[in-house]
């Protein structure tokens, strides 16, 4: 005896919500996809969206992905140039002619850097900040080149953290276990973060709008960037990035509001005692 299998009928009222959910998921995946533009060999640029976690201004996040074996990261301090005052990010780019410039870590009201800072193998600040466990390092002293984001809480990496010519200390945002390394707070600000991805590339992420640190970490960890660990540089008005190469120009200075037009490069006025430049070898 052959039995007919009778499949249950799906009512339209059940199918329609399913179609909507699938459509929303596909659209969400599409909006998360990053469209990379090569700026120079070893340097790519894209824009990540941070909705709904941005609390003020544009939710866009500028993403600069760097191959540390093909580009050179340099720490710059205004005293190296004999400048009477710290430069803003646009002035830094004009002075150094670097392809990209972004802000370094925190500093005191008298512009002294908070933590270790070295440029070209010369110490600009020898006093380590005991609470800061993150360090951006570049140009290994044995001639190995490269760059890394070092988590000083890891003894294996901490012992190697000073064997570099370029050093900028700041605080960790999240570590290799995806653990948040800052206190949760409702304080919002524009953010500059430097991370490493699974391919050991350096990824710089500068927000155009204001996020809490915890929300920003969540957005980055759940992006398609494959980030393994990250440190936070200075935020608020100091969160700055300029990229200039050929016909490509990008500039962001925090904070600015979404209802306002994107600021022109000439409006950047926040002094930055120290910055990180990205150059070709």
Identify the residue ranges that each predicted region occupies.
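Beta-strand-turn-beta hairpins that frame and shape the catalytic cleft
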Residues: 59, 142-146, 197-203
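N-terminal Lys/Arg-rich, disordered targeting/topogenic segments
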Residues: 1-10
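Conserved, well-ordered active-site substructure
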Residues: 111-130, 180-191, 196-229, 238-281
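Active-site-adjacent helix-turn-beta-strand microarchitecture at beta-sheet edges
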Residues: 108-185
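Zymogen propeptides
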Residues: 11-129, 205
């Amino acid at each position: 005896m052959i039995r007919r299998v009778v499949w249950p009928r799906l009512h339209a009222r059940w199918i329609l919500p399913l179609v909507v959910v699938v459509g929303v998921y596909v659209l969400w995946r599409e909006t998360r996809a990053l469209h990379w533009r090569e700026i120079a060999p070893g340097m790519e640029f894209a824009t990540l969206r941070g909705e709904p976690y941005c609390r003020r201004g544009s939710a866009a996040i500028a993403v600069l992905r760097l191959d540390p074996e093909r580009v050179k990261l340099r720490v710059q301090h205004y005293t190296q140039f004999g400048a009477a005052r710290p430069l803003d990010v646009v002035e830094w780019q004009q002075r150094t002619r670097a392809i990209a410039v972004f802000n370094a870590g925190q500093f005191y009201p008298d512009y002294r850097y908070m933590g270790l800072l070295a440029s070209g193998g010369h110490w600009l600040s020898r006093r380590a900040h005991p609470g800061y466990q993150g360090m951006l390092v570049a140009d290994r002293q044995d001639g190995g080149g490269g760059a890394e984001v070092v988590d000083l809480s890891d003894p294996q990496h901490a012992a190697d953290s000073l064997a570099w010519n370029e050093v900028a200390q700041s605080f960790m945002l999240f570590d290799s276990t995806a653990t948040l390394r800052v206190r949760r707070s409702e304080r919002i600000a524009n953010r500059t973060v430097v991370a490493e991805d699974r391919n050991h590339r350096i990824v710089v992420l500068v927000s155009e709008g204001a996020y809490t640190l915890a929300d920003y970490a969540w957005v980055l960890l759940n992006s398609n960037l494959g980030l393994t660990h990250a440190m936070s540089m200075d935020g608020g008005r100091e969160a700055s990035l300029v990229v200039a190469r050929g016909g490509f120009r990008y500039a962001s200075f925090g904070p600015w509001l979404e209802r306002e037009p994107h600021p022109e490069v000439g409006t950047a006025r926040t002094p930055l005692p120290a910055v990180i430049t990205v150059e070709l070898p």
